[in-house]
Swiss-Prot record:
Lineage: superkingdom: Bacteria
Documented EC number(s): 3.7.1.22
Record-given protein name: 3D-(3,5/4)-trihydroxycyclohexane-1,2-dione hydrolase
PROSITE patterns referenced in this protein's UniProt entry, alphabetically: TPP_ENZYMES
Enzyme class label: hydrolase
Gene assigned in the entry: iolD
Length: 644
């Protein structure tokens, strides 16, 4: 047997260079590159291996471990899970910073390979710098926290363990049914230890992502269910994008006259203008999709996890005869809502159903309902685009909270811009193939409802974990995946302040991204939630501490985000009017470096809900009558929802 004597870290790098995926006959490298932040826990081990021979891996320098791992996830998401980035950090705080990103990737079923440094396997120098000592178990380190948020976790305590660990890692990373974060912990001493690795460990490995076919029995059951139903509705989930099944879904909708709503992950699989595309569905959905969904007698979920935002906490579907048909590559997700399961690739399942349903000449019973619903939403959308603030007699979209305070925000932020009007203008002015990236706050709701996707795969929303701080890093990841396209991070001031470190990496790599920063001086989405459930405004506006009350109810904070970003070398713009916004967007397209447009918008001018409800933990007992009323409303809505 031929062997190669290498360190564990060197063997890992050599192995990663030999991984390929094949999908629909197309073969490509699986691991594009590796994000690094070096510390004592990885620099002389994995760092040495990368310096000596990185192979074809692109080596990137992150600025924050969570940020770089978010960028890696966004890269894989934009690549439809067919290519990934790895990330390496030092031991302790560096690795802990990636835990949130691991959870984000796993919640979204997006493959990311995390390689955190770890404490010494020999324990000789214990406690090593940044080690946590657990007196009940000395084998525990910070990296054990990854177990809860990884789809596969392993620790390499001996060099020879690398082989089985990495083979299992690739199994999970290339498994469309159960992929997510894979964490391989690398004790810092073991990284540098040598072993005689067999040459066959480094052979080219092609991981074929196969399209699972539906069984004849499940297909027959699905046909029997569909032919009994008159008003079905489909839900286009992220699985449609990752399976590249958009054309088949369009064919299915057109052939059988069946409309579909979009989840956050599924949006832009098909252009918004398609006659059967109702748009966003659920809590952050629009009136068209939710109205049709309420009356549907069959819900066909295609590649969706049926989150609470998609089902409106299982209260959206109100037809007493409604049943569920789930097409999913994952048995776990297909099993939800007591559904009839078709465990299969979305494309193959749809093609098979098209053949079977055509044989029986199936057609839904919709007449004008689909067109009427879309027309109603287009009318509402036009209204949202044209909302303008007036100092007197103005009623915001989210009304009754602090309408009387809006003039204070006008003065403090120097703006009269409404969020819906800003989004409308941005949607009009961006290139058709531009990619927008979002994750948290009020923007995901506005964008799922309002954004018109004119080209496929241009809407990139992380809403499985709704991770604040994903947006800027996510934009970098999307840009690395599609460097020829303009990429825009749609981010609120709250999320931007949490994390925007990879904006600097975009400058370093000369990968231009555009940050569209919506500043309403607060956590506006959560302010809406608390006040909508009977509370006052508490801890969600960005106000100075009042020296008299000792509370955060003083003057509104105004931050010049453009000035801050300009210090990095970003091209920046200040926007307080639609005219300035248009000028900034046009000029930003001409730039070759990353840009940031600091857009001051008024709170409460985002969209509100349409025909939906969201179950949150309202206090059952309170001295506040409005909280009591909110709790009673919750109980009433729960009575209309499924129990599971």
């Amino acid at each position: 047997m031929q062997t190669v004597r290498m360190t564990t870290a060197q063997a890992l790098v050599k192995f990663l260079n030999q991984q390929y995926v094949e999908f629909d006959g197309k073969q490509q490298k699986f691991v594009k590159g590796i994000f690094t932040i070096f510390g004592h826990g990885n620099v002389v081990g994995l760092g040495q291996a990368l310096e000596e021979d990185a192979g074809e891996l692109e080596v990137y320098q992150g600025r924050n471990e969570q940020g770089m791992a978010n960028a890696a996830m966004a890269f894989a998401k934009q690549k439809h899970r067919k290519q990934i980035m790895a990330c390496t950090s030092s031991v302790g705080p560096g690795s802990a910073n990636m835990i949130t990103s691991a959870a984000t990737a796993s919640a979204n079923n997006i493959p990311v390979l995390l390689l955190p440094g770890d404490v010494f396997a020999t324990r000789q120098p214990d406690p090593v710098l940044q080690q946590i000592e657990q007196t009940h178990d000395l084998s525990i380190s910070t990296n054990d926290a990854f177990r809860a948020v990884s789809k596969y976790w392993d620790r390499i305590n001996r060099p020879e363990q690398l082989m089985t660990a990495m083979i299992q890692a690739m199994r999970v990373l290339t498994n469309p049914a159960d992929t997510g974060a894979v964490t391989i912990c690398l004790p810092q001493d073991v990284q540098g230890e040598a072993w005689d690795f067999p040459s066959y460990f480094f052979q080219k490995r092609v991981h074929r992502i196969e399209r699972r076919l539906p069984t004849k029995a499940s297909l027959a059951d699905a046909v029997e269910m569909i032919k009994r139903k008159k008003k079905p509705v489909m839900i286009c989930g992220g699985g449609v994008r990752y399976a590249e099944a958009a054309e088949e879904l369009k064919q299915f909708a057109e052939t059988f006259h069946i409309p579909f709503g979009e989840t956050q992950a599924g949006k832009s699989a098909i252009e918004s203008s398609h006659p059967y595309n109702l748009g966003g569905i659920g809590v952050t959905g629009n009136v068209a999709a939710n109205t049709i969904a309420k009356e549907a007698d069959l819900v066909i979920g295609i590649g969706t996890r049926f989150t609470d935002f998609t089902t409106a906490s299982k209260q959206l579907f109100q037809n007493e005869e409604v049943e569920f048909l789930n097409i999913n590559i994952s048995e776990f997700h297909a099993n939800k809502l007591d559904a009839l399961k078709v465990i299969a690739d979305a494309k193959e399942a749809l093609l098979a159903l098209i053949d079977e349903l055509q044989e029986i000449d199936y057609q839904s019973s919709y007449t004008v309902e689909i067109a009427d619903a879309k027309d109603a939403w287009e009318t509402e959308l036009s209204r949202l685009h044209n909302i303008r603030f007036t100092c007197q007699d103005f009623t915001p979209e989210v009304e009754g909270h602090f309408d009387e305070n809006l003039n204070e925000y006008v003065d403090a932020l120097g703006t009269q811009l409404t969020q819906t009007a800003v989004i409308g203008q941005i949607n009009t002015l961006l290139d058709e193939d531009a990619i927008i990236v979002g994750a948290a706050g009020s923007l995901p709701g506005d964008l799922q409802r309002m954004w018109a996707s004119r080209k496929p795969n241009t809407y990139h929303m992380e809403y499985g974990y709704s991770c604040m701080g994903y947006e800027v890093a996510g934009a970098l990841g999307a840009k690395l995946a599609e460097p020829s396209k303009e990429v825009y991070a749609m981010v609120g001031d709250g999320s931007y302040q949490m994390l925007h470190s990879e904006l600097v990496t975009s400058l370093q790599e000369n990968k231009k991204i555009n940050v569209l920063l919506f500043d309403n001086s607060g956590f506006g989405c959560i302010n809406n939630l608390q006040m909508g459930n009977g509370m006052g405004s508490f801890g969600t506006e960005f106000r100075y501490r009042n020296q008299e009350t000792r509370k955060l109810d003083g003057a509104i904070m105004k931050i010049d985000f453009a000035a801050s970003a300009a210090g990095y070398g970003v091209k920046t713009y200040h926007v307080t009017s639609l005219e300035q916004l248009q000028e900034a967007l046009i000029d930003a397209k001409k730039q070759t470096v990353s840009t940031l447009i600091d857009i001051k918008v008024l709170p409460k001018t985002m969209t509100n809900g349409y025909e939906s409800w969201w179950h949150v933990g309202v206090a059952e007992v309170s001295k506040n009558q409005s909280v009591q009323a909110a709790y009673e409303s919750k109980v009433s809505n729960l009575q209309q929802a499924r129990s599971y």
